[in-house]
């Protein structure tokens, strides 16, 4: 399976989710809105929470400040962008990037319903972020980077758009070192699209962060997502 094939499988999987919803993920406890507290979810449109497909809550670990610019990679229905926009306030800015027009349409409607005016949703690939160099203070993401066929350009782009001193605070699925693939990702695109086959091993993840020039990398497991795989907080900083 080529990188293009993987992208198409992921695109088809999440396009269908945009059409049918993802509320059942929250019942699992490992995914989606279940990773957020009820008070937080009560303050956002239900359509944003119902389409949450992440593996954590970036806002539990990132200390956003008023006036900051934050970027959410793979912003989906807009939940984390809406929360970010409120935390950075009217002097700040929250961007979301997604490669699906269907998700962008939903996210923009959710932001409008939430009364958020300092958020912008952009069409693009996380391997080619449509923002200027050194334009962002914080990059967040929620169970999206594992979907990329090649993580190296993703983190190179993250480093490019971060300002000096900017920080990374993302949730992703990370595989334990030594774990064999559960399935052959070259023939089963669904295992990639549902956050299985694309997970980097722990040590490989740290190497990719370092190769991008990011410093103080750390990975903290939060919960199991499958055999040998974990939802994890990934942190780093641009020097």
Stretch-by-stretch model annotation:
Residues 139-140:
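Hydrophobic beta-strand segment of the Class I
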Residues 1-34:
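N-terminal auxiliary segments of SAM/dcSAM-dependent transferases
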Residues 197-212:
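Short alpha-helix
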Residues 152-167:
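A short glycine-rich, Lys/Arg-flanked "PGG" loop and its adjoining helix->strand segment in the class I
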Residues 174-196:
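Short, glycine-/aromatic-enriched active-site segment of Class I SAM-dependent methyltransferases
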Residues 65-128:
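Class I SAM-dependent methyltransferase SAM/SAH-binding core
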Residues 30-69, 83, 87:
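Conserved alpha-helix/loop element of class I SAM-dependent methyltransferases that forms part
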Residues 212-239:
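Core SAM-dependent methyltransferase catalytic element
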């Amino acid at each position: 399976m080529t990188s293009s094939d993987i992208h198409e499988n992921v695109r088809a999987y999440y396009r269908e989710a945009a059409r049918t919803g993802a509320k059942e993920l929250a019942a699992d406890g490992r995914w989606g809105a279940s990773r957020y507290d009820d008070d937080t979810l009560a303050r956002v449109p239900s359509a944003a929470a119902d389409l949450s497909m992440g593996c954590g809550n970036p806002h539990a670990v990132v200390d956003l400040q008023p006036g900051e610019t934050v970027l959410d990679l793979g912003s989906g229905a807009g939940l984390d962008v809406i929360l970010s926009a409120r935390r950075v306030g009217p002097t700040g800015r929250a961007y979301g990037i997604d490669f699906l027009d269907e998700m962008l349409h939903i996210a923009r409607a959710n932001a409008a319903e939430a009364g958020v005016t300092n958020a912008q949703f952009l069409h693009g690939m996380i391997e080619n972020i449509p923002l200027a160099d050194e334009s962002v203070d914080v990059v967040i993401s929620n169970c999206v980077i594992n979907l990329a066929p090649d993580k190296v350009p993703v983190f190179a782009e993250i480093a490019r758009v971060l300002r000096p001193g900017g920080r990374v605070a993302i949730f992703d699925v990370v595989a334990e070192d030594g774990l064999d693939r559960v399935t052959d990702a070259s023939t089963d695109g669904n295992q990639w699209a549902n956050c299985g086959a694309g997970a980097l091993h722990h040590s490989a993840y740290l190497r990719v962060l370092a190769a991008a020039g990011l410093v103080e990398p750390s990975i903290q497991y939060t919960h199991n997502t499958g055999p040998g795989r974990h939802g994890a907080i990934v942190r780093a900083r641009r020097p």
